[in-house]
Amino acid sequence: MAIKIDRIDAGSEAEALGLQPGDELLSVDENELNDTLDYDFYTDSSSFHLKAKVADGIREWDVRRTERGPFGCDFSTYLGDQKHSCSNHCMFCFIDQLPPGMRESLYFKDDDERLSFLFGNYITMTNMQDHEIDRIIKMHISPINISVHTTNPQLRVRMLANKRGGEVLKYLPRLVEGGIAVNCQLVLCRGINDGEELRRTLGDLLELTPMVQSIAAVPCGVTDYRQNLFKQTPYDAETSAAVIDIMEEFGDECKRRHGKRIIYPSDEWYLKAGRPIPPAEFYEDFDQLENGVGMMRLFEDEFRAELDRPHRIYGTKQIDVVTGTMAGPLITELMEELHHQYPMIDVKVHVVKNNFFGGNVGVAGLVTATDIIAQCEGKLESGTLGIPAVMLREEKDTFLDDVTVAQLAQRMGVKVEVLPTSGGEEAKALLRSGLHISRRRKGGTT
């Protein structure tokens, strides 16, 4: 295995050795380099033996370093091989429920422990072996994000449709004993792993604290594309409230015993149950934002905090913004408050129902351009449309349905502004000049 160099940092020790972009690093101290985790770990030393494939063959160096830290090689990919694909057939898998016509990359299911550390992906551990656990502990790759779902081995085999689903639960205590911090995700399926099974899971995971540093529960997503899949019944207000009660009960007990809650229901449970989102203190360090835990609380608090700061506004501004059905009431309330404090700013909120996936999906991050066009075309009141960044891929240029921001702007006949995910930054974006402004000048208006 090898990792190919994409760029050499100027003035670095790698440059001093004569390494070039395109060279391939093979090993450090005879340790094969499979990915950038290996590279970072083995080159963070005062001396090492480096082997690389260069333009004229294989070269080796005995490296003596003046100081530890980055060696100076950058890579276009973090992995020397392919991503580890998922070997499960989970009863709740959202990717299996995707409609056709979306971005091609969305149909790939990864289950790679390296991506867990590098990018926060959640893994089930079913394609991991003992030597990979040993490597994580040796290199102290921490934290690791694990999709647990249940600690009942037989039930986990059933839920993941993988015979190793229960067996690999033994890796959890090994990781914890090895000093690896773990964030846990529980995707709950109504009548399957909630109720008493949820109590069992939370009780088992609490035995692994404090190295299990957070546990989040999210409801199984249900789209209209579940043909030939396990029948899932969406959670309603009553069953969502029951999940909240169990999670909060165990969270309260954990806080009494360990001084920290660590157990959090995602925002969606509270919205489904018709209960208010808890205050910021409930979420402590906001360890599970990517699972939608405390995201609405943080957004609201940051937005209001920014509104409380003084802002000098010139002229008038008008903008339309879109959001999903879950966040719709909160975003509408915040925009009304913005207009109340700054009457010269008028924000029209368009709550977009997710017909693309089906009526049970309400998060803003899964809204597509297709639904925005279908529901908002001809209804905009300004020349600017604000799109939350969570609706787009990381490069902020393409929706889930493979429609680009430029294509949406052309179809709608407006300028499209990508709004930040942070509540404070979104408030700043709406308050700053340059969205759609009319300024009064002496002798007339423009």
Regions found by a protein language model. Name each.
Residues 1-9:
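PDZ/PDZ-like groove recognition
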Residues 4, 274-446:
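Radical SAM enzyme core and accessory elements
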Residues 14-34:
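Conserved PDZ fold ligand-binding element
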Residues 22, 212, 254-264, 345, ...:
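Flexible, glycine/charged-enriched surface loops at secondary-structure junctions
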Residues 27-51:
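PDZ domains, with a preference for the canonical peptide-binding region formed by the helix
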Residues 58, 65-211, 221-250:
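Conserved Radical SAM active-site core
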Residues 143-145, 181-183, 214-216, 262-264, ...:
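Structural preference for beta-strand elements that scaffold enzyme active sites
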Residues 192, 212-238, 258-281, 354-360, ...:
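Flexible glycine/acidic-rich beta-alpha junction loops that bind and position SAM and/or redox cofactors
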